[in-house]
């Protein structure tokens, strides 16, 4: 075959250049991103940063007692170097763009969270925002961003930026009222997200819980901050509220009583703390199914049985449905209500004989504080309980000693909208930025248990 024929065949099978503008734009953006020619401003900042690193390292002594405490010097919500770096990486979030020019704006950009990585050098004062700027950043995220966008839209952005705020407080070892203020608002954000986004695709409830409860995370840090404030004889207005959340997030932990021993007396006198401790005691049960399955999240529901407990589920649901429990408390209780309902059904099973009539569906709704018929139907199906119908309406539930109850492995499999009954008519931004004790605001008269619960007659 001649050379000319081969060249013609190559040209024939050669793909034609794409006329799609989007493709050309993507290629141009990719070329700009991986170009070796950096922006002049970024180059200047990079050189300045290198000099700052050398100066900072020279000041640090090998003796930790003489080492200087890191104090942030960044006066904006986002450090200048990070902003220029993210511009080159095309990592600017749409919320950080100027609405007119569509360019990154220094007053709209917020520092993103970065994991500490080897080879990046020490954290510099210019990378860290002081407490006053961190407080302004939190106000911007919760009072502006969450007021402008829905929680579903803004959750990922706010979650990432608040992690960066906590990181800046941590590297400065800041134990101040500004730190308390910021951590309290961040805690409310995660608590509300647990409930509001529970059924949103790609939302991880487990990750949200870890941000609240794991060692060195939000509620743990708040506990340390409160303890430090007590040593300084300073008062924290919302301490009782968040101590109550600590208890409610640990309903499945039998060691909560030990953690409360260090709390001051005035905290125990607050109604919100009394209510949370009462709910904790009533939530304990002794009919857990002992299992070694790794699929069960023990951070939510303990598999340990509590000795000498009376399985007082009716009292638990009466208190939980009352005005004594606020919306945010209800958001946390939603995590445990499915497990407590499982314990209630197992306890009721032992009390009723097959010779008796079946439990009326409406009565069981009141006993288990189900917010709708569909919720109770789903609960019964998840536990393998048979429901009797009159026409299309559920009339009774078959539950007696002969009934076999299937205990769901994951409580998240059961839909629970317990907190919806307590949700106030206000937006998420207002709920997060309460100016007074959350235990006394946003109470809604309960629809359930207006009358004494009907107990099945034998």
Curated annotation (Swiss-Prot):
Gene3D superfamilies associated with the record: 1.25.40.990
Annotated GO biological process: mRNA export from nucleus; poly(A)+ mRNA export from nucleus
Biased composition (Basic and acidic residues): 17-26
Source domain of life: Eukaryota
PROSITE patterns associated with the record: PCI
Cystine pairings recorded for this chain: none
Keyword Repeat recorded: no
Segments forming domain PCI: 211-411
Biased composition (Basic residues): 1-16
A Pfam family it matches: SAC3_GANP
Subcellular location: Cytoplasm; Nucleus, Nucleolus
Region (Disordered): 1-33
Keywords: Cytoplasm, Nucleus
Family: Belongs to the SAC3 family.
Protein name per UniProt: SAC3 family protein 2
Native organism: Schizosaccharomyces pombe (strain 972 / ATCC 24843) (Fission yeast)
